[in-house]
Amino acid sequence: MLFMVIYTWEPGQRNELVRRRIEKGKLIREGVKVLGEWTDLGGGRAFSLVESNDAKSFMSGTNRWGDLMKVEAVPVIDTEELMKWAKGRKKA
């Protein structure tokens, strides 16, 4: 399953976030694969696309950052995959 993860933080948290990320890395749990990461150039927000078959393990990993930022995880699907599924349903 794919998740789009949105991280938001207050300006005063930036330095601690950078320090922790440099020192400890991504803090990703076993069974979770990071497919991409992007940072908002305006600051205060970043995005990750991750894949995991175990939502509980994935979500427990996001808690490691909860003291510094808000973490939202949204289950997503590739649009082309969804369109193929919808097309098949329409015929049925």
Language-model regions, residue ranges each:
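Short S/T/G/P-rich N-terminal loop/turn motif that feeds into the first structured element of a domain
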Residues: 1-35, 39-44, 53-56, 77-92
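Conserved short beta-strand edge segments in small beta-sheet-based binding/regulatory domains
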Residues: 68-79
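A short local loop/turn or secondary-structure capping micro-motif enriched for an aromatic residue
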Residues: 13-14, 67-69
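Conserved catalytic core of Hanks-type protein kinase domains
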Residues: 51-52, 64
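Short active-site oxyanion
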Residues: 45-47, 70
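Short, electropositive alpha-helical surface patch
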Residues: 58-65
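Proline-centered flexible-loop/turn and helix-kink motifs
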Residues: 30, 66-67
